[in-house]
A protein has these predicted regions:
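A glycine- and small-aliphatic-rich helix-loop capping segment at beta-alpha/alpha-beta transitions
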Residues: 49-60, 85, 151-160
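N-terminal glycine-/serine-/threonine-rich phosphate-binding loop
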Residues: 1-36
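Ligand-binding beta-strand-loop-alpha-helix segment within the catalytic cores
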Residues: 60-134
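Glycine-rich N-terminal segment of FAD-binding domains in flavoprotein oxidoreductases
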Residues: 32-55
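ATP/nucleoside-binding phosphotransfer catalytic cores, i.e., glycine-rich phosphate-binding loops
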Residues: 187-241
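A short secondary-structure junction signal
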Residues: 115-116, 147-152, 201-205, 241
Length: 241
């Protein structure tokens, strides 16, 4: 695990964007394509807007990039809270990404079927025995959740690399998420976290004793890949080391 701490949100985003470009181009050179699982939320939105801006959009052959979603809210794709819709507006439309390169969760299906079908689509994409994304982008919630791996949910104990539906009792809503074992098979995993509101969660996940029920992001530990954190000084404020 490597922790990269920067002075500001702007520096965090710029450095993660540069990292994204490097990983993407290396994968394209080696295999002819780049597979990335996107994260939802306000922080990743700023990253996607940066990647599709004039300073970055010419640095990757975007027609060789295949986009997936590490988690999704169980809402229509036209809903304002949809991770797909956010990525569509911030990334896909500005970069003119074709539908053949966008692998979204079909939220028109029943929730368990949506999760199952997404797992099947991912398995078909990866012809090798092991499902191994080139890059999985993750955020971190104030409650130490990542993707839709929330505290005290049964999916935390899944041991199979797959996609599952999760019911969040406090929100009375479903989400669909990669399991931790699926995330952990990736070649590269990157957390994007900034702001003092995330400082406690960063400390819990990185430095506290293992307690996945309360700090689910502790589950993220790539088995044969690289884990990097991109955080600002505010988010790192409670780290002891």
């Amino acid at each position: 695990m490597k922790i990269n701490i920067f002075n500001s949100e702007t520096e965090v985003l710029a450095n993660l964007a540069a990292y994204f470009v490097t990983i993407a181009n290396n994968a394209i050179v080696q295999t002819g394509k780049f597979s990335v699982a996107l994260s939802g939320g306000s922080s990743p939105k700023k990253l996607y807007e940066l990647l599709s801006s004039p300073s970055f959009k010419e640095k990757v052959d975007w027609h060789k990039v295949d986009f997936f979603f590490g988690d999704e809210r169980y809402v229509p794709q036209t809903d304002s809270s949809s991770n797909y819709l956010m990525a569509k507006k911030a990334l896909f439309e500005p970069l003119q990404i074709g539908p053949a390169h966008i692998f979204a969760v079909d939220t028109s299906l029943k929730v368990d079927n949506a999760a199952q079908q997404y797992a099947v689509a991912i398995t078909k994409y990866f012809t090798a025995d092991k499902i191994q994304f080139d890059l999985v982008l993750l955020g971190l919630g104030d409650n130490s959740h990542t993707a839709s791996l929330f505290p005290h949910t049964t999916v935390l104990h899944d041991t199979i690399p797959s996609v599952k539906a999760v019911y969040l009792e406090d929100q009375k809503k479903y989400r669909i998420t990669f399991t931790a074992p699926l995330i952990n098979q990736a070649h590269h995993v990157a957390f994007l976290v900034y702001g003092d509101a995330k400082a406690k969660a960063v400390h819990h996940v990185i430095e506290d004793k293992r307690d996945i029920e309360n700090f689910p992001a502790q589950l993220i530990a790539p088995s044969d890949g690289e884990l990097q954190w991109f955080i600002d000084k505010a988010a790192a404020a409670k780290l002891k080391q």
